[in-house]
Amino acid sequence: MHLVPYSIKDPKTRKLQDFPSMTIACYQLRPESLGSIHIRSPDPKAQPAIRFNFLADPIDQAAMVGGFRMMRKIVDAAPMDAYRGEEFSPGPSVKADEEI
């Protein structure tokens, strides 16, 4: 899990939000899901076929949902009151595991 004191408005341009914000994220560092990389051509400049296969394993899905819930708990804690604004992504209405 990491927290940075800004958030990105547009990932393509890397422009920051126009208001004070933060980004908090979690990662499954030892995933069970397996992806693949396959060579498609003898040409060394040709792009390989990459299948990331993120979150294919239920263990990874559960870890990410748990991490997300932990992030919300940390941000909702009283010591964060002075710094916390409204959650805008994914938004406070997202509550069910399937939505997360």
PLM region descriptions:
Residues 1-100:
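FAD-dependent oxidoreductase catalytic-site/capping-region signature
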